[in-house]
């Protein structure tokens, strides 16, 4: 069971408020599956950047070859990276750049990974205490705790 998104959208999370809102407000129709830069299937919220990328993905992957490989940031953040290695079976984007944008709360440029399951409190941003109460007991608090 993966519950990272549940904790990322709590009040106590140090994530940018836009980061929390993008994850909390995404409905099932907003979440897409695509090929990550690591070559693994990934789910994320369909943001403006991801929509643009997916429109170009097929062509980018078709043109990817080791002789055209490049890492513009030179950060070597991944051992295997479709962009850095020129591997067309993987995504052709800089994951470090897109995740950094998401961390800053940049909804237009960020990549916001998110599971497909609904969140325990829907679109509400609740406390860690409420989340743990729900996860451990199955009891969903009806009214939010005071901030």
Regions found by a protein language model. Name each.
Residues 1-147:
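Conserved active-site-proximal phosphate/metal-binding subdomains
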């Amino acid at each position: 069971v993966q519950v990272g998104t549940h904790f990322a959208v709590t009040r106590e999370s140090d994530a940018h408020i836009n980061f929390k809102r993008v994850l909390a407000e995404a409905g099932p129709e907003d979440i897409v599956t695509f090929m990550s830069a690591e070559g693994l299937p990934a789910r994320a919220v369909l943001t403006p950047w991801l929509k643009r990328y997916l429109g170009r993905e097929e062509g980018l992957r078709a043109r990817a070859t080791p002789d055209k490989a490049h890492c513009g940031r030179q950060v070597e953040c991944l051992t295997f990276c479709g962009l850095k290695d020129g591997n067309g079976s993987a995504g052709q984007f800089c994951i470090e750049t897109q995740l950094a944008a998401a961390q800053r709360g940049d909804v237009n440029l960020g990549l916001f990974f998110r599971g497909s399951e609904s969140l325990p409190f829907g679109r509400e941003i609740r406390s860690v205490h409420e989340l743990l109460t729900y996860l451990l007991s199955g009891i969903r608090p009806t009214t939010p705790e005071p901030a």
